[in-house]
Structures are given as C-alpha cells and as structure tokens.
C-alpha cells in the first residue's frame, strides 16, 4: 500500500465549507474569536472532516466500492495551518470463494507527528481484482485496479 497521503494545509475556508456541507455549524470550527474565548488557541477541524480525509486514504487502496467497514477514534485536534498525513498498514488478509478481505489499521497524523485520528477499515474485492493488483501493484488507483 502507498506509504502516505498528505492533505492540507487545513484552512479556515475548508472548515467553513465543511460546516456548510455537513450542517456542523459549531462556531468553534470557523469563528476564531469564539474559539479563543472558549479557551482554544483558535479554530480546529471538525472530527468528521478528519475522518473523511482518513477514509479517502483508506478507500484509495482498493477503490471506494471495496469499503465494507470504517471506524475511527479521535485523538487530538487539528488546527488551521496543520498538514495531516494518512498512513496505514495491512493487519489481516483472508480469502473466500467470493473475494479477498483486507483489514487496514489507519492513522492521520499532523506535521509534528501527533496522532489526530486512529482508524480501521475493512475492504473486500473480488479474487480476480486482488490477483491483478498483486501482480501489478502500481496499477491500484482510487477507482480500483485499472
């Protein structure tokens, strides 16, 4: 699997756009004065926005249609200006008559190495697709095996 995928830097515009799209209108995510008055150093990314970035990295491994399960735990805040990197490792591969199931342990870390989001994804692809990917791993794309 690719070693990493970088996102960012995180901007206030990204947070405002995500707030509008998701309906998460908590001013902690877009109003700097409000966030500082609440004791934070500034606005910070929505947890679900970070989960979406990590799921993007996970889904890119075998294609978005392969995702069967995805879960995260939020560990630390991501601030405006941070650059986050998705990474992962295969922890389990099982085969059946219909396909190959792959479990990934995922992490989203800041440029300082702080773990922001920990996650796990379960992906499943038809055996024929997996065999093609194993013989030509460089052909894996966000749409699956080319």
Language model features with spans:
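HotDog/MaoC-like acyl-thioester-processing domains
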Residues: 1-6, 79-146
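Hot-dog-fold acyl-thioester-processing enzymes
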Residues: 1-66, 128-146
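Mid-chain, well-packed structural core segment of small domains
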Residues: 61-88
């Amino acid at each position: 699997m690719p070693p990493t995928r970088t996102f960012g830097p995180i901007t206030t515009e990204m947070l405002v756009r995500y707030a509008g799209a998701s309906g998460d209108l908590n001013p902690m995510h877009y109003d700097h004065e409000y966030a500082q008055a609440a004791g934070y150093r500034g606005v910070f990314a929505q947890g679900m926005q970070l989960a979406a970035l990590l799921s993007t990295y996970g889904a890119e491994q075998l294609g978005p249609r392969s995702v069967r399960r995805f879960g995260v735990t939020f560990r630390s805040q991501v601030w405006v200006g941070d650059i986050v990197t998705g990474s992962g490792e295969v922890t389990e591969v099982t085969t059946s008559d219909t396909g190959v199931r792959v479990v990934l342990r995922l992490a989203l870390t800041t440029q300082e190495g702080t773990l922001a989001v920990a996650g796990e994804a379960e992906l499943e692809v038809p055996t024929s697709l997996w065999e093609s990917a194993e013989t030509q791993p460089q052909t894996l794309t966000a749409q699956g095996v080319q």
